[in-house]
């Protein structure tokens, strides 16, 4: 199965025309945090930095680590979202936060008790979780929860008490159980692509989360094919999660180059407050604040992970079809727009 999967991914990369990561080894840890980031935190703690010590105490006492639950929430055989009376995905996102925060605490303090907790969570899901379930909302699980488990595993990958065999099994579990759901959404979108003859049925956060998951998984598993697959959907793909702007995008109602609902950043407003004179409005902007902020967050998580691999996706997005100089600072212009929300 894995061989067929990678052949499929490689064909997508060829169609896209761009390979964002070559066969060179990935840097580890190299997702949301690099080793240099952890070293900087440890140095501030060692120097007795007041703010760093306060932050450490806040992390130690955070609910996912201690609080009312000094143990894992229930690990479900099938993580479910979207069907009333059957939802249990809340357990997964709480446990993902627990694993991630405990991984952080182990990494900056060296205290193995935290490392043991993080590994216990990751192993429990690898052993007991068999799949993701629900209605169409199942497609939100990889991008809003799965990447957090991956970041925890990326931090813990060199933990001496996590056997190499268990780490390899965890990576395969993420491919077999989680990646298949992410891939299915990106390529079929619950059959809306075929039924509606376009890629725009879902708001951008759906695709952003699944692409973020793929970028993260590719780094964790040292698989450039999966990393490139995720970056393709963000930088060249046809969906609302994509930064790609082409002449094929419709100009709906005269509202900018793309119009509402087509592309991650459809509008570019001349404004001196923005980088190079533009504030860039995202596709989720105009909805509630949670959705609007999540769009920038998910994109930033993916691009920060890419940045830590030497792929500066923040700055290599110039597109001649975008008005003025806005295309040279697409993400920065969007960040300034969202910050004014």
Identify what each model region corresponds to.
Residues 1, 18-24:
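Basic/polar N-terminal segments that are highly enriched at the extreme N-terminus
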Residues 1-8:
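Bacterial N-terminal signal peptides that target proteins for export
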Residues 22-196, 200, 208, 212, ...:
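Extracellular glycan-targeting catalytic surfaces
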Residues 219-341:
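Long, repeat-rich segments with strong aromatic
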Residues 8-17:
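Bacterial N-terminal signal peptides
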Residues 141, 170, 198-209, 218-222, ...:
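Short, contiguous, pocket-lining structural segments
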